[in-house]
Amino acid sequence: MIYQSPTIQVELLEDNIAKLCFNAPGSVNKFDRETLASLDAALDSIKQQSNIQALVLTSGKDTFIVGADITEFLGLFAQDDAVLLSWVEQANAVFNKLEDLPFPTASAIKGFALGGGCEAILATDFRIADTTAKIGLPETKLGIIPGFGGTVRLPRVIGADNALEWITTGKDQRPEDALKVGAVDAVVAPEALEAAAIQMLKDAVAEKLDWQARRQRKMSPLTLPKLEAMMSFTTAKGMVFAVAGKHYPAPMAAVSVVEQAATKGRSDALQIEHQAFIKLAKTDVAKALIGIFLNDQLVKGKAKKAGKLAKDVKSAAVLGAGIMGGGIAYQSASKGTPIVMKDIAQPALDLGLGEAAKLLSAQVARGRSTPEKMAKVLNNITPALDYAPVKHADVVVEAVVEHPKVKAQVLAEVEQYVSEDAIIASNTSTISINLLAKSMKKPERFCGMHFFNPVHKMPLVEVIRGEHSSEETIASVVAYASKMGKTPIVVNDCPGFFVNRVLFPYFAGFNGLLAEGGDFAAIDKVMEKQFGWPMGPAYLLDVVGLDTGHHAQAVMAEGFPDRMGKSGNDAIDVMFENKRLGQKNGKGFYAYSVDSRGKPKKDVDPTSYELLKAAFGEQKAFDADEIIARTMIPMIIETVRCLEEGIVASPAEADMGLVYGLGFPPFRGGVFRYLDTMGVANFVALADKYAHLGGLYQVTDAMRTLAANNGSYYQA
């Protein structure tokens, strides 16, 4: 053994080829500080051995290296620039040491080689991947750029255009795609990986492969004619900005870094990367996006833990077909859990099966599935007009019409047919789980399971704990949601649960602006372009449906009369009463037609303005700051109330619910990250300016205390 640490082992193989194996404690390898220090020491030990002729990097895990340890980032990025620069320079010195070894080097890549893992393989002369490999630089998704030489080496290995696509999108690349552009030199079967890498090194030692020329190319400026370079980078900037927009600076910064470094050798090019990395690491966007990544890990970790208490769900059932039932059935079946889809009407079953078939056909058309897989998934969905096939289900999801009496009746019925230990969940967006539980003989096996529409696209599932729901019930539904490929958050029962409870105060703020003459299209523009929502409030209401919005608003007003009660008609009422239901009937705030691709196309409709003018008078202009304040303050305060009341367990889960359930702008990180970035005291001062508008604008006592103590919701 040449070198051994808890994370890295180096041994000498035959033919004087050294093998460096990353094998940290835990399930994956990461480039944390300990591993970087170990790699540095391992390389020193290797350099001291005079007989070594080549080096192969391998992994003792199912995956190579998943990247840097992101849990270290927020603390590290909060340090002074000098400390951060020192860390980046030290890490790069290690990668340079690997690249500068006096003999050929190769990486044997299996599973993920992402971020720092990808940058490590770029520092070797040869790269061999197996068929399981996924290679990429996802840093821009975290609001930063590669910091261990990725922007310098990748363009010199695969060309600037290919490198910019990899870096700015942050996507994982399949081995065959990596081979096509020259990021890897061969793709082999997993069992042949190490042998193939060693053979390539033997060929290099025997001078059949010119490893020194490859290395020199990575040290040198890019070989791009000046005019071609200018055109290439100008085009890239336009394309990247069109996708990333002004709220996500990292992809544009990556283009700029590659452009500036193109004419430089390795040392100067790395300095350009370091400076850009540090600048981005200090941004609020990086803090928000890294926070989302860490929050996602926390939520998924909780779900994994719940799996230990969960009942094994081998089969499921959904009651109520149609679009929603079909979406749930598709999601369950496509992830491997057979499901019965039960309805009282054959046309509804046909619609549900049609929805599943449509989603599967789209996957086949995009090359993401095959006709054989499609047939297998459809065979996992059993349509039924009676309860007989439901009796074997481990979990039953009730998804009938959103009406308390109908749901209560269906829940009471199905309980008679299922096994004693079957779990029953209601897919409801507004109806109290405690109320529905009253229709059950065994309320401990019952909870809420709120899917968001469209089911196949929306990642969030709210699992709603009723006062009688058992821990096994909650754990089993969380585990089933995870098995379906969803991100579950557990919330306690209250009107609107968590997501709808915080959404409708936002709509109330919007209604308030319209009642004073605000222009809904202007408000949408501000909330989309400036705040960053995927849809403004008017457009979102049209997509949700004004009938659904009208009903949910009434539920919220009844549940929280002090804050959400209404004294008269608002804009939602005006649209609903004039049968303007949104996209579903072609007219809401906007008018809708179908474009050439069959998608709804939105247009301004003068009729909407006439109706609103008749109800609320002449239009009045509001500036962007006031629009943002008056819509967002109610949502933010209601989110804080949900945390204080224990409806949601943590700021992390609340923020993930907002990002995954509502499309809260990821670059802002969620309500609690947004509050911490803004400063709780600054927010309280802003809210106090609007406190005269009513209870939705009045902060809680606990918020005032936190503000007075200069506190925050996240611990840095």
UniProtKB/Swiss-Prot annotation:
EC number: 4.2.1.17, 5.1.2.3, 5.3.3.8, 1.1.1.35
CC terms in the record's Gene Ontology section: fatty acid beta-oxidation multienzyme complex
Residues under site feature: Important for catalytic activity: E119, E139
Signal peptide: none
Record gene name: fadB
Molecular function GO terms recorded: 3-hydroxybutyryl-CoA epimerase activity; delta(3)-delta(2)-enoyl-CoA isomerase activity; enoyl-CoA hydratase activity; long-chain-3-hydroxyacyl-CoA dehydrogenase activity; NAD+ binding
Binding-site list for substrate: D296, N500, Y660
Pfam families registered for this protein in UniProt: 3HCDH, 3HCDH_N, ECH_1
Disulfide bonds: none
Annotated GO biological process: fatty acid beta-oxidation
Name of protein: Fatty acid oxidation complex subunit alpha
Location of the region described as Enoyl-CoA hydratase/isomerase in the Swiss-Prot/TrEMBL record: 1-189
